[in-house]
Amino acid sequence: MKRKDIAKEFLRLAAGGKVREAYEKYVHTDFRHHNPYFRGDRESLLLGMEESAVMFPDKIFEAVRALEDGDLVAVHGRVRLKPDSPWIALFHIFRFEGNHIIEEWEAAQEVPPESPNKNGMF
């Protein structure tokens, strides 16, 4: 399995509420992240993702594209927390050690209902 496929599968499982399974399969024990809302360790983000899965059980995640360059993978995607909520555009950058995610960065932006840009965000 290519690293970009691992990254997409990790996000799919986590967004679908299978956070522990995603972590057990794909996240290195020495994982660290750069999400400003949680401590930078593995366990704090895992717990935050589990809490999100409980709060938003109908969450929809779609990976739009993924790029792989050496030990780095970038996934451009979108998530909808509830069926009637707006889409949120996401970028995740993962650094791998072997076939496990060891570091992660992310950025998110709500998709505006109207935009002068005819190309859209995706």
Residues covered by each model-derived region:
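C-terminal and inter-domain tail/linker signature
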Residues: 1-122
